[in-house]
Regions:
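Conserved N-terminal segment of class I S-adenosyl-L-methionine
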Residues: 1-91, 97, 105, 212-215
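Class I S-adenosyl-L-methionine
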Residues: 163-213
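Acceptor-substrate binding/catalytic loop of class I
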Residues: 122-123, 144, 149-168
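Short conserved AdoMet
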Residues: 62, 137, 171
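Short amphipathic alpha-helices and their capping/turn segments at secondary-structure boundaries
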Residues: 89-101, 129-135
Length: 215
């Protein structure tokens, strides 16, 4: 076409399925990202530690704080404002009761299934929850999300947990609030965990806090 850039056969890159009537999103990741960022912005921590969450979201957090990112697969690229540490969610390289702002979003359901090169561990989510709880400081907050609904294992992709399971796994923490992306993709803030118990594949977002030490 006149005025167009040069075109060669080996530069062709056909995209045939983008002519949709509405924009396509993954509601779990879009809504949990906005939810998590708002929670962190309200607290405005000097440093935030994330374990294995969606990397573009982790990079976005550098707009408001310094971030330590822990993952079993270290980053190959440097991201300004992000310090990367290689680590296993079942054995975090952190001292007990040391972290004041912590997140682990849509991660724990994969632990122990071998999908990412880790060993098999049937109690993967439960042990991950125990480790996250171990490192959370008094007065600290944990943002945690997993697929919720009727509990089952979808090997080797992920697990789906009942909200009650997650509350039991974090029994030594206080649930501050719970939000939900339901099976229709609708975000439902400040919901009751019981509302998700019969879901097929919802996203449960739990904000936990460890009680502050008595003065």
């Amino acid at each position: 076409m006149p005025g167009a850039e040069p075109i060669r056969l080996w530069d062709l890159w056909p995209e045939l399925y983008d002519r949709t009537e509405t924009s396509i999103i993954d509601p779990h990741y879009v809504h949990q990202g906005a939810w998590g960022a708002k929670c962190i912005a309200r607290r405005s921590p000097a440093e935030h530690i994330d374990v294995g969450s969606y990397l573009p979201w982790v990079a976005f957090l550098t707009c408001m704080t310094q971030v330590v990112f822990i993952d079993m697969r270290p980053l190959g690229e440097k991201i300004e404002g992000v310090r990367c540490i290689a680590g296993d969610l079942l054995s975090l390289p952190l001292k007990s009761r040391s972290v004041h702002s912590l997140s682990c979003l849509h991660v724990a359901e994969h632990i122990g299934l071998g999908r990412y090169g880790d060993g098999l561990e049937p109690r993967g989510t439960q042990l991950a929850a125990r480790e996250l709880s171990r490192v959370l400081a008094p007065g600290g907050e944990l943002l945690f999300s997993v697929p919720v609904g009727r509990p089952r294992l979808c090997f080797n992709a992920h697990r789906i947990h009942s909200p009650g399971q997650i509350l039991r796994y974090f029994a030594d923490l206080q649930l501050v609030d719970f939000s939900l992306v339901d099976d229709s993709g609708r975000f439902r803030p400040n919901s009751s965990p019981a509302e998700a118990k019969d879901a097929h594949y919802a996203c449960g977002m739990f904000r936990f806090r460890r009680a502050a030490l008595a003065s």
